[in-house]
């Protein structure tokens, strides 16, 4: 099981586009992976700092609580699929 984390903000235009792609992937893979959404303006978890998030949207996929891949920008559905499967 992987943690798929989306860092976003309400004021971010690309984040609004990406929400549709994210929800589609979450619907398809949500039973297998943990999908976590973090609003960087209200992040009291410290996750943005932990993963070095400097812009939104950013997607991080964590494998087995250690190795992770990070992609900055609003991804197309196929690119998000590759990141999750990678």
Identify the meaning behind each predicted range:
Residues 13, 23, 41, 68:
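Nucleotide phosphate-binding site architecture
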